Amino acid sequence: MAIFARELIGKDVVDSHNETLGKITDIVFDVQSGSITTIIVTLEGDLNPNMLPWDGESGKVMIPVDDVSRFSNKIHLNK
């Protein structure tokens, strides 16, 4: 199944407890394979990126695609 990057930008990202973390604002691709490696998520208002298990700053976190459990109407994480 194929999915376009434009379909992912702006989607809500939820953790394993179905709590909203924020929205996808950018995507990182592997140039060789064309596969998504990382999603960049702009966090909801008061979430502190330093309290999350991913690298982040300035209200954004970089989440490896390996931490994504599924893509649907929301992006579901396995953490």
PLM region spans:
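Peripheral interaction segments used for macromolecular assembly
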Residues: M1-K79
